Amino acid sequence: MAHFLKVTNLDYITELAKGDTAFIHEMITIFLEENPDEIKNLEQAIEEQDFEKIKSFSHHMKSTIPFVGIDVLIGKDLVDIEKLATEKTGANVIKTLFENVKNVCEKAYNELKP
């Protein structure tokens, strides 16, 4: 039997909510609604090598992923993507880092969807 390792961790949002389950549900819903578009937009910016958009999208994602606990898995990747985009360099490295970000976000989405 294969073991499934979860990528999400709701400890941070649970602590932040202080027992407000509606808040937790709302934050998860926001992640489920917004993250697929964030991934799509970042992927398109990477394909177009639009470093300004890459920088902007990766910066925004850094602030949203802690709510579902995936910052420990992809936070550094997003920091590195933003840094490389700021320097307008490393397109291939950005693509590689993005693949990990995308995979983790897809796993998180699948874990959290109702």
Please state what every model-predicted region is:
Residues 1-114:
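Two-component system phosphorelay core
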